[in-house]
Design a protein with these regions (language model features):
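Membrane-cytosol interface segments
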Residues: 1-92, 336
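Histidine- and acidic-residue-rich, metal-dependent catalytic cores
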Residues: 63-64, 68-344
Length: 344
C-alpha cells in the first residue's frame, strides 16, 4: 500500500502473523524528503493502529470463542498426557483432533489463524501452547503439500505430541531465562527419547507420531540429535514437524529477545535450512510464507519504509521493494547490512 493509504485489516493481519506488536526501527533516521513523511513516524502510525486492532480482536466475540477453545485444547492435552505418563492410560487421539478441528473451524487461512494466536501469548503452559501451535502450523504445511485428510490428522497429532517428553524435564530448566549450562542442555536433549518411550506404550498410535517425537530435532545433514540421523533415515512427518517447531520458536517472544520479523526467519532458514531440512518441505513453507507479504508495507534496517513489489524466488528473504518516490531496489543485490526489519 502506498504512503498515506488507510490501514486495512489485511495489512494489520500480516503484522499479527508473526506476532509483531510494534515496528522497532534501528539505525539513524534518514533525512526526510520534501513532501514525504518520515519513515519512523510512519512506522509509529502503523504500530499505533495495529495496537488498536489487537485490542479490537481481543475484545471480539470470535476471539473469545477461540480463546475458550484454545484453553480447552490445552486442558485436554494436560489431562490426557498426565494420565498417559502417570497411569499409562491410552491417549484419546480423536478427542485431541476434535479440539484442533474446533480451532480451525471458520479459520481457513494462516492469517486468520495467527490473528487469533497472536492474542494468546499470555498462556502460561508453554510446552502445551507450543505443541498446539506446532500442530496448527504442521497442519497448514500439510495443506500446502495437498495431503489427504487422514495424513493431515496424523501430522496434526504428531505436532501435538512431539514435545511430550519435555513434561519429564524439570520446569526450572525448561523455563530458565537466558542461556543453559552444558549439563542443563544435555538434559533438554533427552526429551525426544523420553517422548518416544511414552508414546511407545500407546499401541494404537500411528508410528509416524512416535517417530516425530523421537526425530523432530534430527537434521538432514546429520547435525541434529539425539542420534545424528541423516535425511534418508528421518521420518517425513518428523521433518515437517521440525520446520513448524523451529518456526514457532523463532517467532515467539523470549526473555532475551523480541519475536523475529518473518523475513529474518526466512533468512535464517535460507542460511542453512536447505542442508538441515528436507528441500521440498522447506521450499513450500518459505514460498508460502513469503507470498503472504506480496504488496505489503515493510521497514528496512536503515529505517526507510517501502513496499514489496516482487519476490526473488532464489532469495525469498530479499525481495524487490519500491519506495514512496517510485524508485525500486532489489534487496538481493544490496548490501547484507540492508534487510527487512519489520513487516507492517
Amino acid at each position: 500500500a502506498p504512503a498515506g493509504s488507510a490501514v486495512t485489516r489485511q495489512l494489520i493481519n500480516r503484522m499479527k502473523l508473526y506476532r509483531v506488536e510494534y515496528a522497532e526501527i534501528e539505525g539513524e533516521e534518514p533525512a526526510p524528503q520534501e513532501e514525504a513523511p518520515k519513515p519512523v513516524k510512519e512506522a509509529k502510525t502503523y504500530a499505533q493502529e495495529s495496537k488498536t486492532h489487537s485490542q479490537k480482536v481481543a475484545g471480539s466475540s470470535e476471539f473469545r470463542t477461540f480463546q475458550i477453545e484454545y484453553v480447552q485444547a490445552i486442558e485436554l492435552m494436560k489431562q490426557l498426557y498426565t494420565a498417559a505418563i502417570k497411569d499409562n492410560k491410552p491417549i484419546d487421539s480423536q478427542k485431541l483432533l476434535g479440539s484442533v478441528a474446533d480451532l480451525f473451524q471458520s479459520r481457513n487461512t494462516i492469517v486468520e489463524m495467527f490473528d487469533m494466536l497472536y492474542n494468546m501469548r499470555t498462556v502460561a503452559d508453554s510446552v502445551y501452547a507450543h505443541s498446539l501451535n506446532v500442530a496448527l502450523i504442521s497442519r497448514m504445511i500439510g495443506r500446502w503439500l495437498r495431503f489427504e485428510r487422514h495424513d493431515l490428522d496424523i501430522l496434526t497429532l504428531a505436532g501435538l505430541m512431539h514435545d511430550i517428553g519435555k513434561l519429564l524435564i524439570p520446569s526450572d530448566i525448561l523455563n530458565k531465562p537466558g542461556s543453559l549450562t552444558d549439563e542443563e542442555f544435555a538434559k533438554i536433549k533427552q526429551h525426544p527419547a523420553l517422548g518416544y518411550e511414552i508414546l511407545k506404550r500407546q499401541p494404537d498410535l500411528d508410528s509416524r507420531i512416535k517417530k516425530a517425537a523421537l526425530m523432530h530435532h534430527e537434521r538432514c545433514d546429520g547435525s541434529g540429535y539425539p542420534t545424528g540421523l541423516t535425511e534418508d533415515y528421518i521420518d517425513n512427518f518428523a521433518m515437517i514437524v521440525a520446520i513448524a517447531d523451529v518456526y514457532d520458536a523463532m517467532t515467539a517472544a523470549r526473555s532475551y529477545r523480541s519475536p523475529l520479523c518473518p523475513f529474518e526467519v526466512i533468512s535464517k532458514f535460507e542460511e542453512d535450512g536447505f542442508q538441515k531440512y528436507h528441500t521440498k518441505y522447506i521450499l513450500v513453507f518459505l514460498k508460502q510464507i513469503a507470498s503472504t507479504y506480496q504488496s505489503n508495507r515493510v521497514i528496512l534496517s536503515d529505517g526507510r519504509g517501502c513496499t514489496i513489489v516482487m519476490l526473488n524466488q532464489n532469495a525469498l528473504s530479499r525481495p524487490i521493494v519500491q519506495f514512496d518516490d517510485k524508485s525500486c531496489l532489489d534487496l538481493s543485490t544490496a548490501s547484507r547490512d540492508l534487510y527487512i526489519k519489520a513487516v507492517l
